[in-house]
Amino acid sequence: MNLLDIIYVRYYKEDGSSLNIGGIESYITQLAKLASSLGAKVRIFQYGTHDFFKQTDSADVYAYFKSGNKNGDFLLKKAAQKHRHDDKWLTIIANDTLIPNYHVSNSIVIQHGIGFDSCFGKNEPLLINFIKRVYQAYPIIKRMQNVDKVVCVDNNFINWYRTQTSFRDVKLIPILNFTEIGPKEEKVSDGPIKIVFARRFVQIRGTRLFAPVAKKLLSTYDNIEITFAGEGPDKEYLKSTIGNDERINFCAYRSDESISFHRQFDVAVVPTIYSEGTSLSLLEAMSAQCAVVCTNVGGMTNIILDEYNGLMVSPDEGELFSALSRLITDQKLRKFLSKNAYDTVNSSFSINKWQKSWKTIIMNNFEN
């Protein structure tokens, strides 16, 4: 039997009540569907508040209770206990933080982007700050030696890895993230220009970068509306910083409605400060024919060509304000960017392209 084991901390909520909602969980769901369609038996191993078993349309889910450190080692051993001598298996570790300190045979890890490129701590002495970064980087480099392949959601990580070591024994495979492709018909846009920030309301996603920019835009332009779509600890900060304005809206939407939700807007802003792969929020906005403004952080640099399919700026209030002002005042530019954005995701970031890449990896593993 061909077995595909996926190791992740929380695919279902720890109490087993429902599936978790998030980018990695969605990734696992699509990967399980693909592997199942190729004839593999898919099993997901995770932690829980108690042992439980669940079944989805494409996978069996085994949850185990464990006190203390919830690492990948325990789940890998649970998966190995269910192998039979005549099975062919492939183990996919869904996050590189779960790689154990020993080599895992027939294994792939999914690397979701650099997560420690923080700009905080900049008041430290330069040498101390640099040493901290080395301390953060070394465990990542080291644990990549313990898997057979590393699937990277952006080329940013691959290029960073090459700067850290001259060793090329780790097989790094770029399979960039994907999005559902929205309708090709051009959106009808009339009335005020609608801008959306559809991210989790946390500082690393740019809430505190965008809030003062949004306030300035509202005081400068009468013909705009700004929507904050999501939840998170910075919600009250956003409200208090921007103040009361009838042109500001706060809402939430279901992840499976993202494309139709984004099609209500003319402009999408993705002002990440750090820790970003190939942003699903950015891809979904492009698929919905929004003109996009994003920061030059992480894997978003693999998506946007500045002034061709979006505007790319540094994580800077002045640059962000200028870019959004251009889109507010230039309808021709908005249309040009939104069309090219749609064409980009349709050709390079579709789920069909993603499935073909993963199919090759999965089938090669079982055939060899």
Language-model regions: role of each:
Residues 26-30, 197-216, 233-236:
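A conserved mid-protein helix/loop that constitutes part of the nucleotide-sugar donor-binding site
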Residues 306-307, 311-318, 326-332:
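Conserved acidic donor-binding segment of nucleotide-sugar-dependent glycosyltransferases
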Residues 92, 102-123, 130-132, 151:
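Active-site proximal beta-strand in glycosyltransferases
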Residues 291-294, 304:
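Short hydrophobic beta-strand element within catalytic cores of glycosyltransferases
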